[in-house]
């Protein structure tokens, strides 16, 4: 597979190696960008930049892309910067000039200074500003649409010259700008799944609507056996008399001309002129007004909100559909949808065709024989903004002359084109479904129950609309039952239809048993098909008001009664061309090997989930009539056996602190984790983990990442990263080698070195950075003796503790108390609680001076305040009334730990507190008096006591 847009003509081993190297680089750059974007939009936060480090990482990935393939500056002998490339946005896109001009003026105003801002710094500032303002994709589209302008700054192997990768890059940027992870599903997964190319090149066509002016000349080695397929327009070019190579086209009629986009990339101008395929006339080109580059970039469908396309069409609410849907082959529609090819020369009404090709690919050998002469017939079609999905898409909307135009959601064709011999009958199968019945009806399923399908909704659409990826395990279990029931019901209904069809055919054969009549009918049928196929193109030329109509069949019809393609030579005469079931089966067999493996998305091919199995089974019946989901008879009705989540036990542990909020625990919540893995919990760890043994630790984790639970093969455990805080191993997505100080190492070893921690641990440590959670006295009291700075802070906190208690009862110390409140409360109200911020400030020597200043201010207040002087102590040993002492005077005062009395250090030598002795003596005296009172009361009644004793003796 060649890198699209890499316009190079290389031959030999060097050219192949260069192309392979550029492919690997493109793959790596796009993979890094998509990984970063997935991490940003998967958090479901209102602000995508709330994820720590997300903006810096996305800036780095975009810088790598913009620097890739830059032409070196030959004059200054240095690498050029992309600032010269992007600053011309102000000319190409004036509405985006505001974001660039401010940085241009910044650069030009500082050029005269010696410390001027370099171009590289200005470019990085512009890139970061554009990402923050969510306007980077809008600024890059006009630049990336002009390939000649890109070649002035980039080499041919640059990332920006690969159309497919640029389209995926823009989709990633739009996913971030809109905070919509569903846009990432539109990216072709094959670009990430393989680095090597297959011998037979099957290129998936892309919707390159953002690159209207792209051209490409293929390498000489790729001239043969290159197939490009897209079912959005099953049209190819006949074999040229000058060349025998096959050429097929993937139409994207949103550019300036009617020439197919892939064809413009693959054919040189000379080859295009010699192609015998008829092109539209000048009058036809004049009638159609294609969108400009900006309008086309604005109308590119990247989100459900942009699908409305209010600039050129009036959409009805029922036409808007959200989410990826898959084609239900032959789905019956309650409202007939027709696609007509009408000429608008009478009313002068312009309509642009937007047949964007999807991410699916197929071999179009049969398409070259089936629709090789239809290009002129596509004079004008209603614009329909297509949505990319895992299957190919392409459907035109009906346009009635002079009436209101409205666009509908397009769905896939069947990826089937019949392959016939040269000159034989050419058959085409176009099967569509009604998108109105499927759009705008996504109801919220309560408690894991599948909602009932809407009337006329297709089976594949009904199965694929469920968000299986984000459901809990219990809901996935119920999903298996629902999907199994729907498949069984669909298969049984098809069997019944086939049996009834066989019985009808046998009855018809019995009636028409004459062999000659049967042969004559067969010859007439073949002859009519040949005549209609040959007259297909002239019929379109002669018809001005003719219609190209695709009518979806009814659900009661069998699989043989496929869609009818009606075309007429005049408005009055009409011939119906019926497509037989045998033609569908032949085309399905011819494309079975390639289309099935290519149309299914990458995640479906490598998944064993219920939805993947169901979609794979339904693809086996491609081209056949499938019943609508609403027509199925469910094996077990939901009202008889409702599918709900299993009940969670009501007896949940309630914290004593949350007793007043106990009612919140009655809510039924989903249980995260499973028997093998549980997500990390925010916990405070005080101990240093022992040196880990990787094999043993990972085995204890059941070979799963401690953060996301993803399973790792034992051969790849070396890729896991160790978190020093939690002591567990994480995958590279959950552990980005962030470095933080570890609390346990500070408390045990006074080690402030930064260690590698997981993203979860980093976020947790940042959240608790200022929380006083660490009691040094309880965790490691020996740290006071080992660390001098920490002991000094402890003494200052003891003084502040006593001062604050004194000032709370002093009416003259209100201003001083306000200054005490400037520092965190735990520093003045507790003696041993610290936060990580306090410990770090102590290590740097910043906390001690702040506390010392408060201590000096408090001591000065006590010295001149009469109220505070009255709260002092007089030493009972020396009885010096002139020397009043206070508890915060640690240099000369000693406080009793029991009674809190204060004495001079020099006087308090015996180790016994006089106040404690007095209190003890008083307690003993009170106890003695209580005992004497009890005994006196007992002696006043001796007779009663003797009588009681006698009674007791008699009873014994």
UniProtKB/Swiss-Prot annotation:
Keywords, comma-separated and alphabetical: Autophagy, Endocytosis, Endosome, Immunity, Lysosome, Phosphoprotein
Location of Phosphoserine modifications: 198, 250, 268, 390, 412, 513, 547, 655
Segments of this protein annotated with the region Interaction with BECN1: 490-542
Record flagged with keyword Phosphoprotein: yes
UniProt-listed InterPro entries: Autophagy_HostDef_Reg, RH_dom, RUBC_PIKBD, Run_dom, Run_dom_sf
Region described as Disordered: 233-423, 547-579
Biased segments, Low complexity type: 233-242, 339-371, 547-566
PROSITE patterns, A to Z: RUN (PS50826)
Annotated ranges, domain RUN: 49-190
Superkingdom field: Eukaryota
GO biological process, one term: autophagy
Span list, region Interaction with YWHAB: 205-437
One Gene Ontology cellular component annotation held by this UniProt entry: late endosome
Renumbered residue ranges of the record's region Interaction with Rab7: 705-956
Record localization: Late endosome; Lysosome; Early endosome
Record's compositionally biased regions (Acidic residues): 570-579
One Gene Ontology term of the molecular function aspect: phosphatidylinositol 3-kinase inhibitor activity
Keyword presence, Ion transport: no
Residue ranges, annotated region (Interaction with UVRAG): 302-585
Pfam families linked: RH_dom, RUBC_PIKBD, RUN
Region described as Interaction with PIK3C3: 50-181
Complex and partners: Associates with PI3K (PI3KC3/PI3K-III/class III phosphatidylinositol 3-kinase) complex II (PI3KC3-C2) in which the core composed of the catalytic subunit PIK3C3, the regulatory subunit PIK3R4 and BECN1 is associated with UVRAG; in the complex interacts directly with PI3KC3 and UVRAG. Interacts with Rab7 (RAB7A or RAB7B) (GTP-bound form); Rab7 and UVRAG compete for RUBCN binding; can interact simultaneously with Rab7 and the PI3K complex. Interacts with CYBA and CYBB; indicative for the association with the CYBA:CYBB NADPH oxidase heterodimer.
Cited function: Inhibits PIK3C3 activity; under basal conditions negatively regulates PI3K complex II (PI3KC3-C2) function in autophagy. Negatively regulates endosome maturation and degradative endocytic trafficking and impairs autophagosome maturation process. Can sequester UVRAG from association with a class C Vps complex (possibly the HOPS complex) and negatively regulates Rab7 activation.
Protein name: Run domain Beclin-1-interacting and cysteine-rich domain-containing protein
Taxonomic lineage from the root: Eukaryota, Metazoa, Chordata, Craniata, Vertebrata
Gene encoding the protein: Rubcn
């Amino acid at each position: 597979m060649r890198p699209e847009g890499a316009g190079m003509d290389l031959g030999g081993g060097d050219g192949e190696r260069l192309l392979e190297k550029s492919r690997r680089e493109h793959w790596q750059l796009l993979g890094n960008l998509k990984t970063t974007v997935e991490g940003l939009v998967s958090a479901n936060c209102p602000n995508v930049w709330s994820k720590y480090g997300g903006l810096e990482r996305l800036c780095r990935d975009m810088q790598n892309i913009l620097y890739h393939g830059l032409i070196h500056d030959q004059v200054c002998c240095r690498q050029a910067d992309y600032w010269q490339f992007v600053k011309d946005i102000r000319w190409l896109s004036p509405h985006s000039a505001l974001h660039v001009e401010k940085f241009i003026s910044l650069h030009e105003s500082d050029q005269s200074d010696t410390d001027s801002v370099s171009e590289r710094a200005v470019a990085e500032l512009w890139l970061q500003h554009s990402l923050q303002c969510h306007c980077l994709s809008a600024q890059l589209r006009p630049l990336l649409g002009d390939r000649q302008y890109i070649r002035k700054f980039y080499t041919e192997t640059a990332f920006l010259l690969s159309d497919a990768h640029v389209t995926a890059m823009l989709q990633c940027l739009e996913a971030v700008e809109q905070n919509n992870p569903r846009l990432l599903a539109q990216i072709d997964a094959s670009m990430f799944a393989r680095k090597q190319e297959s011998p037979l090149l099957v290129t998936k066509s892309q919707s390159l609507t953002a690159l209207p002016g792209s051209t490409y000349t293929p390498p000489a080695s790729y001239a043969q056996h290159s197939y490009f397929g897209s079912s959005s327009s099953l049209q190819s070019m006949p074999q040229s008399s000058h060349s025998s190579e096959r050429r097929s086209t993937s139409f994207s009629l949103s550019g300036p001309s009617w020439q197919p986009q892939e064809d413009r990339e693959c054919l040189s101008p000379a080859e295009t002129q010699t192609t015998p395929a008829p092109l539209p006339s000048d009058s036809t080109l004049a009638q159609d007004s294609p969108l400009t580059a900006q309008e086309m970039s604005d109308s590119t469908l990247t989100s459900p909100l942009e699908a409305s396309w209010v600039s050129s069409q009036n959409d009805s609410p029922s036409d808007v559909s959200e989410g990826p849907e898959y084609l239900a082959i032959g789905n019956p529609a309650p409202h007939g949808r027709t696609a007509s090819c009408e000429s608008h020369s009478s009313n002068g009404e312009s309509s642009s065709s937007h047949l964007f090709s999807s991410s699916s690919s197929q071999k179009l050998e049969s398409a070259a024989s089936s629709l090789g002469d239809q290009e002129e017939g596509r004079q004008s079609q209603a614009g329909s903004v297509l949505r990319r999905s895992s299957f190919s898409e392409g459907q035109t909307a009906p346009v009635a002359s002079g009436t209101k135009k409205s666009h509908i959601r397009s769905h896939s064709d069947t990826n089937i084109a019949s392959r016939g011999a040269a000159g034989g009958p050419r058959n085409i199968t176009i099967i569509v479904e009604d998108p109105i019945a499927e759009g705008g009806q996504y109801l919220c399923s309560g408690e894991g129950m599948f909602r009932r399908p809407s009337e006329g909704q297709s089976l594949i659409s009904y199965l694929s609309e469920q968000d299986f990826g984000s459901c809990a395990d219990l809901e996935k279990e119920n999903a298996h039952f629902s999907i199994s029931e729907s498949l069984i019901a669909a298969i049984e209904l098809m069997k019944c239809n086939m049996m009834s069809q066989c019985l009808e055919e046998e009855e018809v054969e019995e009636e028409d048993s004459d062999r000659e009549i049967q042969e004559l009918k067969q010859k007439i049928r073949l002859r009519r098909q040949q005549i209609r196929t040959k007259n297909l193109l002239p019929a379109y030329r002669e018809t001005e008001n003719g219609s190209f109509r695709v009518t979806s069949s009814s659900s009661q019809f069998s699989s043989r009664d496929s869609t009818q393609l009606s075309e007429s030579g005049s408005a009055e005469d009409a011939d119906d061309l019926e497509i037989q079931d045998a033609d569908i089966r032949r085309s399905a067999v011819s494309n079975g090997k390639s289309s099935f493996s290519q149309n299914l998305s990458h995640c479906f091919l490598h998944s064993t989930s219920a939805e993947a199995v169901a979609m794979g089974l339904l693809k086996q019946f491609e081209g056949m009539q499938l019943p609508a989901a609403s027509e199925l008879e469910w094996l077990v009705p939901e009202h008889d056996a409702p599918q709900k989540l299993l009940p969670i036990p009501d007896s949940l542990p309630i914290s004593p602190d949350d007793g007043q909020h106990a009612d919140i625990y009655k809510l039924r919540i989903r249980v995260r984790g499973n028997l093998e893995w549980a997500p990390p919990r925010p916990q405070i760890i005080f101990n240093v983990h022992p040196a880990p043994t990787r094999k043993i630790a990972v085995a204890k984790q059941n070979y799963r990442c401690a953060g996301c639970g993803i399973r790792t093969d034992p051969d790849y455990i070396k890729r896991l990263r160790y978190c020093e805080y939690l002591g567990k191993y994480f995958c590279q997505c959950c552990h980005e080698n962030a470095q933080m100080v570890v609390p346990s190492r500070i408390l045990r070893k006074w080690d402030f070195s930064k260690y590698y921690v997981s993203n979860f641990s980093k976020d947790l440590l940042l959240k608790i950075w200022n929380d006083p959670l660490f009691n040094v006295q309880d965790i490691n009291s020996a740290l006071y003796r080992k660390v001098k700075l920490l002991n000094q802070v402890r003494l200052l906190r003891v003084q502040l503790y006593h001062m604050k208690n004194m000032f709370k009862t002093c009416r003259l110390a209100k201003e001083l108390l306000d200054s005490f409140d400037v520092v965190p409360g735990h520093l003045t109200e507790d003696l041993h609680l610290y936060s990580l911020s306090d410990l770090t400030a102590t290590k740097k020597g910043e906390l001690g001076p702040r506390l010392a200043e408060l201590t000096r201010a408090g001591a000065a207040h006590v010295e001149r305040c009469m109220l505070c002087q009255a709260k002092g102590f007089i030493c009972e040993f020396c009885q010096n009334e002139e020397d009043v002492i206070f508890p915060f005077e640690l240099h000369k005062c000693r406080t009793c730990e029991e009674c809190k009395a204060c004495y001079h250090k020099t006087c308090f030598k015996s180790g016994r507190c006089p106040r404690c002795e007095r209190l003890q003596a008083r307690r003993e005296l009170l106890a003695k008096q209580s005992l004497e009172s009890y005994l006196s009361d007992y002696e006043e009644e001796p007779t009663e006591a003797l009588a009681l004793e006698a009674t007791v003796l008699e009873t014994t």
